Amino acid sequence: MEPLDELDLLLLEEDGGAEAVPRVELLRKKADALFPETVLSRGVDNRYLVLAVETSQNERGAEEKRLHVTASQDREHEVLCILRNGWSSVPVEPGDIVHLEGDCTSEPWIIDDDFGYFILYPDMMISGTSVASSIRCLRRAVLSETFRGSDPATRQMLIGTILHEVFQKAISESFAPERLQELALQTLREVRHLKEMYRLNLSQDEILCEVEEYLPSFSKWAEDFMRKGPSSEFPQMQLSLPSDGSNRSSPCNIEVVKSLDIEESIWSPRFGLKGKIDVTVGVKIHRDCKMKYKVMPLELKTGKESNSIEHRSQVVLYTLLSQERREDPEAGWLLYLKTGQMYPVPANHLDKRELLKLRNWLAASLLHRVSRAAPGEEARLSALPQIIEEEKTCKYCSQIGNCALYSRAVEEQGDDASIPEAMLSKIQEETRHLQLAHLKYFSLWCLMLTLESQSKDNRKTHQSIWLTPASELEESGNCVGNLVRTEPVSRVCDGQYLHNFQRKNGPMPATNLMAGDRIILSGEERKLFALSKGYVKKMNKAAVTCLLDRNLSTLPATTVFRLDREERHGDISTPLGNLSKLMESTDPSKRLRELIIDFREPQFIAYLSSVLPHDAKDTVANILKGLNKPQRQAMKRVLLSKDYTLIVGMPGTGKTTTICALVRILSACGFSVLLTSYTHSAVDNILLKLAKFKVGFLRLGQSHKVHPDIQKFTEEEICRSRSIASLAHLEELYNSHPIVATTCMGINHPIFSRKTFDFCIVDEASQISQPVCLGPLFFSRRFVLVGDHQQLPPLVVNREARALGMSESLFKRLERNESAVVQLTVQYRMNRKIMSLSNKLTYAGKLECGSDRVANAVLALPNLKDARLSLQLYADYSDSPWLAGVLEPDNPVCFLNTDKVPAPEQVENGGVSNVTEARLIVFLTSTFIKAGCSPSDIGVIAPYRQQLRIISDLLARSSVGMVEVNTVDKYQGRDKSLILVSFVRSNEDGTLGELLKDWRRLNVALTRAKHKLILLGSVSSLKRFPPLGTLFDHLNAEQLILDLPSREHESLSHILGDCQRD
């Protein structure tokens, strides 16, 4: 059961007895589970914890909610908040975190139609666009947020984006007709726009022609509102500003003085809103011979001039956002670019109130996407807001497919009487091609993904930016504060600006931030949250260089900044989008449903001659000469496949070499290939080998995430070096590369809208969750999954999702079709003794050494004699059996049993460690280095981060060089000559923890060493659990367990202490 569910159960208990946890503490824990690290506080950015909710009627018979809330960390001071009128319908519960907006000079807080605002889950930032779109249909807004990125690109969207950019550049420069024409041409030549034209199969000329139709309106608007002249000559409008002392509209002349910012990014922790304002303008309002200057939002629209409630609502919300940076603008502007018509949009209390209520309902729907009939019962997906009865709105809705699919698969409303009649037929029409098994697959994976995204580790929002000072957060290693800009900002291209920062005072702190990390840049001043997003380009002890999406040179030079790592662990938009695509009524989706959900048998071609071109036979034969028999068998199986092939890459069997050979053979045969994996490093490892064979390929993805030796093959670098500025040249680039490489998350690239590959190869497929792995498969006729389900599965944090089957990869799911499976069994990593462990535990003797040299290889210790002499200093240890056995190169495997030492574990602050094991690891590491083993050839593995930290600290204080200390997961796919494994757990109550119960992690740990493997732990504690019991049976039979004798325990501290002082 997840922690949040356990808390719900406890909260239901009426009497917990004397030892019961106080109810207030349970509510606080529930709040922490929903929003980790929230700090309760009063003031402008107040955060209150709801302790109790009572619904009652006032003296007039109207319903109101009485909330008992507290903002004190010790929860001793309780405050009453009364919600009246429409606010009483807000779905607030005990344990929720809320923000109260208004005046509370005397208690209680009273929030009603006329005064104050109530913000539910204020640390959940929701875009103003999403709130505005929920006006007509809340269901659509929830679906758009849930299936983010599934909205198809359109011609209108592209033209709108281009027009926005032309206007935004012009307002900072000039609206002269000839300059507008230049700006339009420049913008159309930007590679990012050329890519969208390619996606939509449009030409530059037709887009330019349409853009040019708007340009005269741009000039006219500027002539009306930005020219020089007396105030009486500026356009007159009706506008009310409460700060003038009147709420009535009265005529005034409007002069737009200048543009102050473009795409100003504002996050509001007061209102739980975020957004980017198209243009922030300085405006003079001339009325009755008086002038008032205001900084106001200007929203640009390229569609039909409707002055609709959605459009006006966006402007109202931007006025709320503007209050985070400056005084209340009280109104904003709505400009339709086609006509040049600009409308004033007053932001009155009523409009803001109703929009914030909508925002609360949207936040509640997004947060509570999983429900239970009762605490402790099985999770299920919550129903979405009701389907509306508005045929016209639904007809043009981009989420109609997902709406119908969710209704059928999750809400099971195929013939529900509650659905409007007009929509019932639409739901059936959208989903009639789907069978029950397809709907169940969709529903199950939606549930599992949602559970995973709502785990505490994935719930962390960005609230630390506004709730925790940078000086405090720096200790976590994920933030650097007190930064100032040092050099002029340089423009890489539109949307990419290079910024250099250094510490205002002192050197850079120790940090986990490194090149390639996503970051959010904010000002340390309260009003400057989330100014820009981007990546760390370069970082050292003196300075940090960042590539940001906005040019911040307009901010004062004295502005002090902070960088926060952007965590994106809980983002499920891509896998949910893939699931939605799998349910579409298209041929690729239908075929994948048959293979993956219905388990249709994969088909194969009978004769190799029918797929192997005559002129490629010699090339293929030469490539095959360098492969072993299982690898050659894999090549044949792939060439004969009509659907898919699974290649099982057992440890050390040359998986990367096999994939490289496969790509070369497919290329020689004239096939196009899409090469993917989950990580950039896995993709680049293959490409590094391909590059040595002079095989051409196109690498998609941002250059700074790609291996330095592969960057010259990226689309970004090629476009830059060739100065690509036309669609014809971009198409030529795409068409000239039959081999394309990207990660599984990069499948939204425009190239895939018009290109289908003959083969898709997915490396590390057994580590990728099914919906993520699906993405690239839509764009190929056949696919090859390479992996090993006996090694690490997809990482799943949520226990319930794991129990439902989320850790089953597509590789594992399809492995039941044995005709499609080829096993690589000849390995070139481990010597015979180390290999025998994995053969016994996992592979049923299938693994074999590739040569006698591999089988008999031992750890090279050129200075072993000197090391043994130095150990003579410790007379009691010089001839100890365990130490002699460990150091002996001809003993490749040994388990050091700590039962008699003793070596008890420590559990503190949720972390598990074992200091004695850590000290032993450091002692052994130091001894092997003295014996001549290079620090770079040694790897230390431990299952717990706390243990890793202790070992790393001890190594840092010793004379030992740079030795890699990491978890099993980080060592997947890699090896070292010497591996030392600390199992950590040593207790009498049988507690082992989830990590050590996973036999696949154990298998990975046992197969990382090439020449020597040293395991360290408590046999009595570990043997209770399979497969560790099986491991000990084998080790005992081979006499590979060495007991650390009790008589040596007394001297152990002395020896280890001396070791660290050396």
Curated annotation (Swiss-Prot):
Residue positions binding [4Fe-4S] cluster: C137, C394, C397, C403
Cofactor-binding details, from the entry: Binds 1 [4Fe-4S] cluster.
Post-translational note: Acetylated by EP300, leading to stimulate the 5'-3' endonuclease, the 5'-3' helicase and DNA-dependent ATPase activities, possibly by increasing DNA substrate affinity.
Cofactor(s) named in the record: [4Fe-4S] cluster
Residues binding ATP, per UniProt: G649, M650, P651, G652, T653, G654, K655, T656
EC annotation from Swiss-Prot or TrEMBL: 3.1.-.-, 3.6.4.12
Pfam families, alphabetized: AAA_11, AAA_12, Dna2, Dna2_Rift
Gene Ontology cellular component annotations, sorted alphabetically: chromosome, telomeric region; gamma DNA polymerase complex; mitochondrial nucleoid; nucleoplasm
SUPFAM superfamilies: P-loop containing nucleoside triphosphate hydrolases
UniProt entry keywords in alphabetical sequence: 4Fe-4S, Acetylation, ATP-binding, DNA damage, DNA repair, DNA replication, DNA-binding, Endonuclease, Helicase, Hydrolase, Iron, Iron-sulfur, Metal-binding, Mitochondrion, Multifunctional enzyme, Nuclease, Nucleotide-binding, Nucleus
Enzyme class: hydrolase
Annotated spans, Helicase activity: 521-1062
GO MF term list: 4 iron, 4 sulfur cluster binding; 5'-3' DNA helicase activity; 5'-flap endonuclease activity; ATP binding; ATP hydrolysis activity; DNA binding; metal ion binding; nuclease activity
Gene3D superfamilies referenced in this protein's UniProt entry, alphabetically: 3.90.320.10, P-loop containing nucleotide triphosphate hydrolases (3.40.50.300)
Principal subcellular localization: nucleus
Subcellular localization, as worded in the UniProt entry: Nucleus; Mitochondrion
Domain of life: Eukaryota
GO BP: base-excision repair; DNA double-strand break processing; DNA replication; DNA replication checkpoint signaling; DNA replication, Okazaki fragment processing; DNA replication, removal of RNA primer; mitochondrial DNA repair; mitochondrial DNA replication
Region (Nuclease activity): 82-520
Family: Belongs to the DNA2/NAM7 helicase family.
Function description: Key enzyme involved in DNA replication and DNA repair in nucleus and mitochondrion. Involved in Okazaki fragments processing by cleaving long flaps that escape FEN1: flaps that are longer than 27 nucleotides are coated by replication protein A complex (RPA), leading to recruit DNA2 which cleaves the flap until it is too short to bind RPA and becomes a substrate for FEN1. Also involved in 5'-end resection of DNA during double-strand break (DSB) repair: recruited by BLM and mediates the cleavage of 5'-ssDNA, while the 3'-ssDNA cleavage is prevented by the presence of RPA.
Assembly with partners or alone: Interacts with BLM and WDHD1.
The name this protein goes by in its record: DNA replication ATP-dependent helicase/nuclease DNA2
Gene that this polypeptide is encoded by: Dna2
